[in-house]
Amino acid sequence: MSTPLKVHHWGSQGVPVVALHSSGLSGLQWRRLAEKCSSFHQILAPDFFGYGASPQSPNGLDFRYTEDLEQVLSTIDGLDQRCILLGHSYGGFLALKAALARPEKVAALCLYEPVIWGGLASFRACPIEDVVCRFDPQLLLLDKSLAGTSEYLETFIDYWNGSGSWAQMSEAQRAPVIKGASKIAAEVFEVVTDSTPHHVYAALKQPVQILHGTSSPKEVLDMKDILTATISGSTTACIPGGHMNPIRNPIPVNANFALFLKRWRDGALTP
């Protein structure tokens, strides 16, 4: 099946790997890992709507995450064998959704800090607003109309990268964030307001590993704990740093992804 998204390809043999990027980035996030593993796997990394070489979503701020998910499923459906899913943050969220939708097509998952806000809210038995207000008292991230404003972007960047990060960014560093601000805001709203309860992820029977940092936001580390407690047989690996480790500290992150793939090739992974 075809997809309107740009899909980056590396390698041509072995078990396919579909790698899903974080908000604000593109499929090229996975280039170094893909080049390292392309002798053993065919690797496909799409640019989601609004990023890289892919078109914008026709729905603007009314974007739904299912638009990206449908394209991921189309990519998976076009493969002639089961694939391994890799993901970071929003990409990890989509990977979990794809594995639930196509269990027969997904062999294993290795994800860096996938975000499951609905699962966190259901586990804590509270409205999502109660979760968000801890770090965003004005609930700016739930207001898509603020997309692209300095107050929204500062709240978003500082949450994921640490207090003061937005102020320290140069104009050149801010430019791609500002360019993708509408899609980022639409994604954030979609993911944060997703109501999928945590127990749904117990349906995943594939080998699952969750990678995480040491200084990531508390909510994200709680999500990791919830997933590993919910998904039978899942494992974790800890890497010094925070949520943006795949960009800021890629060598150990990619080493963990590569090790997971090697263990799969060696038959060392079991559900």
Where does each model-flagged region fall?
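Flexible "cap/lid" loop of the alpha/beta hydrolase fold
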Residues: 96, 100, 105-143
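Active-site loop/oxyanion-hole signature of alpha/beta-hydrolase fold enzymes
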Residues: 35, 44-86, 90, 255
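Glycine-rich His-Gly loop
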Residues: 20-22, 89, 213
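Catalytic histidine-centered segment of alpha/beta-hydrolase-like enzymes
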Residues: 239-254
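Conserved catalytic-core motifs of eukaryotic protein kinase domains, centered on the activation segment
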Residues: 29-31, 54-60, 120-123, 221-222
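Conserved serine/cysteine hydrolase catalytic core
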Residues: 173-229
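Conserved alpha/beta-hydrolase catalytic His-Asp/Glu region
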Residues: 144-185
